[in-house]
Amino acid sequence: MSHSSGIPASQELISAFGSANTGDVRLIKVVIKNDELVVDQKLNVQSDFETDLELAHSVLQKDSPCYILYKKDDKSIELTGYNWIFMFFVPDNAKVREKMTYAATRGNLKRELGASHFVDEIYSSNMNDFSKKGYQQHKLHQESEAPLTMEEQQRNDEKEQGLFVGGGGSGMHVHGISFPVDSDASTAVSNFINKKFNYIELSVNVDDEKIIFSSSSNIDIEAISSKISSTEPSFHFFRYSHQHEGENLDSIIYIYSCPDGSNGTKSAPVRKRMLFSSSKANVEQLVTSHNVKIDLKLEINSPSEISEESIINELHPPKVEEKKAFSKPSRPGRK
């Protein structure tokens, strides 16, 4: 499932960036307002590139994430206009929802303005990193870096996908958010593990930022789709007791549903989708932390994607008969 938020750049921002490529603008501060990327502030060139970096520091607010599009003095070889630095400030004390939304929107912003315009990127939760001294340290760090290991490259790839959320110094990466769990949700998980119910639904209270209980029951596999909302994201655990090839099985199925407007569904607000998406791994751990194995994980956008047949095919894929290879004749003189 994509971690992109889908929040677009406003026409005003696109025009402002285009004009700045040939004008006197040094930086453009960009924020998210009403589910749109908009210009919050513009400052003109005052001195040389490095000295003007103090301007970037001056537009930051200690509690508010933002992007800064910072124009360098050198022009692009391949494109019309100047080279730019993409800056992403996300303070530690910003709200979790803001962190996730800004992290997931970074890629959209670069793509809509043209990623090739940006020759360098700075991510940090520390305001002092957005200054002349901070930039010099950033360049020294780049020059001293050893070639990336495979694991480091993977983390960088995750950053490109929008998983960066800040967290001190030069930044950090997270794979999810760990919200507190409501007592009713904990009880529901225990009841599920102890086989009191074969189905439970959990959700996220977006206002309280907490994992909450939605429902529990004993149902047949055919009823799962009717339990899944076509308008709200949700998490579902189902124990599928069945026989396969003469063996009695209890398969645990974990479903994350996030309606996207397709197949008759209604897409949830962007911030809600991001909070649910970033919580799915931690919701899964509510069950797996009890040494319970998840046999099948499904991510869907519509209840219509779930059926008994689709679940069985995922759990027990039909065997494909392999064609018998032609035998090679024995070499002459061999028995």
UniProtKB/Swiss-Prot annotation:
Compartments reported by the entry: Cytoplasm, Cytoskeleton; Cytoplasm, Cell cortex
Keyword terms: Actin-binding, Cytoplasm, Cytoskeleton, Repeat
Cellular component, GO annotation: actin cytoskeleton; actin filament; cell cortex; cytoplasm
Residue ranges constituting the ADF-H domain according to the UniProt record: 4-140, 176-316
GO molecular function: actin filament binding; actin monomer binding; protein tyrosine kinase activity
Primary site of residence: cytoplasm
Annotated region described as Disordered, given as residue ranges: 307-335
UniProt xrefs under SMART domains: ADF
Basic and acidic residues bias: start-end ranges: 316-325
BP GO annotations: actin filament depolymerization; barbed-end actin filament capping
SUPFAM superfamilies xref list: Actin depolymerizing proteins
Known partners and oligomeric status: Interacts with G-actin; ADP-actin form.
Job of this protein: Actin-binding protein involved in motile and morphological processes. Inhibits actin polymerization, likely by sequestering G-actin.
Protein family according to the UniProt entry: Belongs to the actin-binding proteins ADF family. Twinfilin subfamily.
Protein name from the UniProt record: Twinfilin
Species per Swiss-Prot/TrEMBL record: Dictyostelium discoideum (Social amoeba)
Organismal lineage: Eukaryota, Amoebozoa, Evosea, Eumycetozoa, Dictyostelia
